[in-house]
Amino acid sequence: MAADGYPLLLLQKTFPQLLCIEFKWVDIHYSKANSQVLPIMWQIPKFMYAIFREHNTLKHIVDAYGIDTIISDNRFGLWHKKVKSIYITHQIGVIVSPKNKALNYLAYLLHKKIINRYDECWIPDFEGTDNLSGDLSHKYPLPENAYFVGILSRFQ
């Protein structure tokens, strides 16, 4: 298993018998204002480099440890052509700006392109009107490899 920060600590506590690898990601900074356009735009080079770096690091990890399945929790670069790769997200549509529908649609298309690199996309929500994620997962058409898996929670 690979993660960083609190998710890594949770995985180590939950699965102490399994190997855990620290896999850092960049810190994302959001604006306190409604629009995230400029804050996200300024971070695009950092995101692109991080995606490239994590994808290359993953190749080495797969080779070194003989990984046969990857489950990525919203990490864009954690897919591998030769290994079953699953992407988990509740956000198919990305709301970059509440007022700019064209920009939000462009963000959706870019995210869909990322999702299509994976074998499957799991959406932790319910299909239909009784759902938790609203427009984030239900506004735009789902990629062909995406489906709803119900609520995922460690709480019982």
Predicted regions mapped to residue ranges:
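Short, well-ordered beta-strand core segments
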Residues: C20, I70, S85, C121-W122, ...
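Structural motif corresponding to alpha-helix initiation and N-cap regions
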Residues: G5, F52-N56, Y108
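Conserved nucleotide-sugar donor-binding subdomain of glycosyltransferases
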Residues: S35-G77
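Conserved nucleotide-sugar phosphate-binding/catalytic loop shared by glycosyltransferases and other
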Residues: M1-I44
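Short loop/helix-cap segments at secondary-structure boundaries that form the rim of catalytic
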Residues: L9-F15, F76-V83, I115, H138-L142
